[in-house]
């Protein structure tokens, strides 16, 4: 049955201008010898002579423009701005940097706190009068005596 039923497939064809024969569109030449010129070849520009020397090759490549550098104007305003920028950058470096992530050890933190306390420690009793100092020393002596007596009992 399949032999009797032949499928007719309609192909896209083009006719040869010399022999008027129908040739498939994909063919670039006709059996009679005629060569079909593709539209790409018609529209394409013919390449000029290829540069033979290395200098011409470098010229053929696209040139990149150089970066434009601004000239600095020597004025007091610009100097002031530069000084401000420098002072700001220095002030940021003075701050204590907090490290990100897990702390390495707790002892390092304690050492930092002790240093800060020593730096911030101010003598409160410097402006204290002699009478007040005597009253406080008597009170401290009584407190110390009571604590020592408690230790002896235990």
From Swiss-Prot:
Keywords (A to Z) from UniProt: Coiled coil, Phosphoprotein
InterPro entries: C16orf87-like (IPR040246), UPF0547 (IPR018886)
Transmembrane segments: none
Keyword Acetylation appears in the UniProt entry: no
Pfam families, alphabetized: UPF0547
Coiled-coil ranges (or none): 104-132
Modified residue annotations for Phosphoserine: 91
Keyword Transcription regulation: no
Highest taxon in the source lineage: Eukaryota
Biased composition (Basic and acidic residues): 68-84, 109-119
Family indicated by similarity: Belongs to the UPF0547 family.
Protein name: UPF0547 protein C16orf87 homolog
Gene source species: Bos taurus
């Amino acid at each position: 049955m399949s032999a009797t039923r032949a499928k007719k497939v309609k192909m896209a064809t083009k006719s040869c201008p010399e022999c008027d024969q129908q040739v498939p569109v994909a063919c670039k030449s006709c059996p009679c010898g005629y060569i079909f010129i593709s539209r790409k070849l018609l529209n394409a520009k013919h390449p000029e002579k290829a540069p033979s020397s290395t200098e011409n090759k470098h010229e053929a490549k696209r040139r990149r423009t150089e970066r434009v550098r601004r000239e600095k104007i020597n004025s007091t305003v610009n100097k002031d701005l530069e000084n401000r920028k420098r002072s700001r950058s220095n002030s940021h470096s003075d701050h204590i940097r907090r490290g990100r992530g897990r702390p390495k050890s707790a002892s390092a933190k304690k050492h930092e706190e002790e240093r800060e306390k020593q730096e911030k420690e101010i003598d409160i009793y410097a402006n204290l009068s002699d009478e007040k100092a005597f009253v406080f020393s008597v009170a401290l002596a009584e407190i110390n005596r009571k604590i020592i007596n408690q230790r002896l009992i235990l």
